[in-house]
Each structure stands twice: as C-alpha cells, then as structure tokens.
Amino acid sequence: MVATVVNVQVKNEEKIETAPKKVVFDTKNLNLWYGEDHALKDINLSIHENEVTAIIGPSGCGKSTYLKTLNRMVELVPIVRTTGVIEYRERNIFDKSYPVEELRTHVGMVFQKPNPFPKSIYENVTYGPKIHGIRDKKTLDEIVEKSLRGAAIWDELKDRLHDNAYGLSGGQQQRLCIARCLAIEPDVILMDEPTSALDPISTLKVEELIQELKKDFSIVIVTHNMQQAARISDKTAFFLSGEVVEYTDTNKLFTTPSDKRTEDYITGRFG
C-alpha cells in the first residue's frame, strides 16, 4: 500500500544506525473522560528525546487533549478524570507526590495563538525565572539574551527589550513566547498548533527554529497541517476518535502507512 499525498513532501534522510534514544514520555493505557465523554482511549505511545513528534488527526480526535495531559494542564477542566500511566523520565506524572509545578518546569508549552503578557519583552522572558526565585539582574540579563537567541529573535529585539510585547508582529510574538518557554530551561516543549495563526514567512521561521531546538529539547507538536508534520517531524502519531491509529517514523507514515484509515486521512478522503 502506497499513499499518494498531494503536495506533501517528506524529509529524505539517509538511514544511519544510531543508539536508541531515551524515552522522555511513556504513555501506558491512558484513558481520559470529560464527564461522560470518553476523549482518549487506551493510548500507548513513547516519545523520545531530541526528536520532533507530530500528532495529526481531524478536529476533535483528541490531539490537543493528549498534549495537555503531558503537563497536566488538562486538569484545569474540573470534570476530567483519567486512568492509566504517563511516565516522564520514568516517574508517573499522576503520582500525588509529584508536584504539578515541578512537572511544568520540565515541560513547557507554546499555544496556538501567541499570548505574550501585557508587559515589556524583557519582563515576558524573565517572568518564569523570577517566579522560581531568580532576582539577580546580571543573571536575568543573561537569561533574556540566551532565551531570545535560542528563539532566533535576539537580533530583532535586542534594542527593544523594554518595549511592550504587544507591539510585535504575530510571528515575533510567537517566537517571544517560545523564548519565554526556554527561559525556564525545560526538557520538553509542547506546541499546540504554533503556526496556525501566522503568515507563511513567520511559519517558515518557526519551523526552522523547531529544527534547531530539537538539538537540545524534545518537542511534541500538534498540527492540522500534514505538510508541516511531514517537513519537520521525526515521528508522527495519527489520532482518530480518541485512539492512536498509527505511530511510526514520519517518512513511513506518509509513504507506506500500515492502516487503511491512515491512508484515507493523509490522502484527503476524510478530515
């Protein structure tokens, strides 16, 4: 079975034998309900370090719900309940002895719509470090420069650090939000449709940034854009009706999917 997807180009990479990468998140038999709505069903999925893992699927399939479960943001909805296990670095994130604040220092998040605080660029980046007790001006200055460089936006903003973040373009705001995430030195970055509100040029910059960031971070990205998933990810999971239909190397999923439902989705027969 060979899927032909219009305008989707997968990365052409040579196969090089390397040691297996460590598992960052190991999800085992995860089920989640919103009240009576069974939103995630028996999810089993391992996410590896220094890779970009894309999650694709039609609207309402559970992509964003799963993403927000990885840092327990989903618990902000009072009617949520879960069964199963998600291990982060071999520690169950649902364990009552695991403070959610600690988890979120390791697992940062970038949202669909850029959401800078109504503060200066400098204050946006230093917000997280200050919450964690860093007050030294020299240290904060270093964090700001390192984070903005990490988000590939230092040269654009270095002379505007005390300007209000609302004065930035949409693409700049999103990269500022990525810098704000980097400032707390996370291990994993979750991205929920990070380019859906951006123009093509800004989207390209964010995609290029993601490729750089995976050298130091593990990235999980939810996207409706299959072309984007094919361009930037190492592995892709296809969700449908709250289930993982297929999870494999991105090249394989987009060229030789093993499940007919995957082929039907990526070739546009539904979605």
Curated annotation (Swiss-Prot):
Keyword NAD: no
EC number: 7.3.2.1
Reactions catalysed, as given in the entry: phosphate(out) + ATP + H2O = ADP + 2 phosphate(in) + H(+)
GO CC entries: plasma membrane
Subcellular location: Cell membrane
GO MF annotation list: ATP binding; ATP hydrolysis activity; ATPase-coupled phosphate ion transmembrane transporter activity
A GO BP entry: phosphate ion transmembrane transport
Main location: membrane
Entry keywords, A to Z: ATP-binding, Cell membrane, Membrane, Nucleotide-binding, Phosphate transport, Translocase, Transport
Listed InterPro entries: AAA+_ATPase (IPR003593), ABC_transporter-like_ATP-bd (IPR003439), ABC_transporter-like_CS (IPR017871), P-loop_NTPase (IPR027417), PstB-like (IPR005670)
Membrane topology: Peripheral membrane protein
Annotated positions binding ATP: 57-64
Domain ABC transporter: 25-266
Subunit details: The complex is composed of two ATP-binding proteins (PstB), two transmembrane proteins (PstC and PstA) and a solute-binding protein (PstS).
Protein purpose: Part of the ABC transporter complex PstSACB involved in phosphate import. Responsible for energy coupling to the transport system.
Family label: Belongs to the ABC transporter superfamily. Phosphate importer (TC 3.A.1.7) family.
The name this protein goes by in its record: Phosphate import ATP-binding protein PstB
Biological source species: Bacillus cereus (strain ATCC 14579 / DSM 31 / CCUG 7414 / JCM 2152 / NBRC 15305 / NCIMB 9373 / NCTC 2599 / NRRL B-3711)
Species lineage: Bacteria, Bacillati, Bacillota, Bacilli, Bacillales
